[in-house]
Amino acid sequence: MSDLLDVQHRTAEIEGLSVFYREAGDPESPKMLLLGGFPASSHQFRNLIPALADRFHVLSPDYPGFGNTDMPEDFEYTFDHLSRIVESLLVRTGFHPFGLYHQDYGGPIGNRIVARHPDWLEWQVIQNSNAYDEGFTAAWDGIRHALWVDRTPETEAPLLPFLERDGVKLVYTHGHRDPERISPDNWNMDLHFLERPGARKVQLD
């Protein structure tokens, strides 16, 4: 049983991409799918996965362009396409039905999957993710216009600092009552992947 609790670091070929995922727990246990968000990867769940593995069969993927999954240049980086890559991974691994934990980008990705396969969803935990356009408050209007309505290098420029060290660090520390409890490994890992050629463009896409 102890071996089943160890986190496995695996890859699967999906649509010609090497898709990385973390997996732990007894395959006979209830399944729990962890879908994270910007700017991280399954690395954000590195402590949660082993804490759940004694009760759940846990899986968490890196999306294309994130973490250890391939980042092809010729790829449609949309929530719909990302959801279909994750869906194909779940089919390949037989990982369904499941409980779904989704955070940030995990919301529009996970909700698309369960909309296509409602029988796969047993329960869900929602943390800071959005299901509807109405969930975007007026504070998002400038970003939505810059990227979705009138996208140019000029409209992108004010958003680029969010992909630099201080911006990525802010994702983890903003509003936290004790930032010294947050390991810098988090944003340093994200920055490692963001510094790949073309990675910032992928995130803006």
Where do the PLM segments sit?
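The serine-hydrolase catalytic nucleophile loop
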Residues: 37-49
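Flexible "cap/lid" subdomain of the alpha/beta-hydrolase fold that forms the substrate-access gate
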Residues: 2-19, 24-27, 31, 39, ...
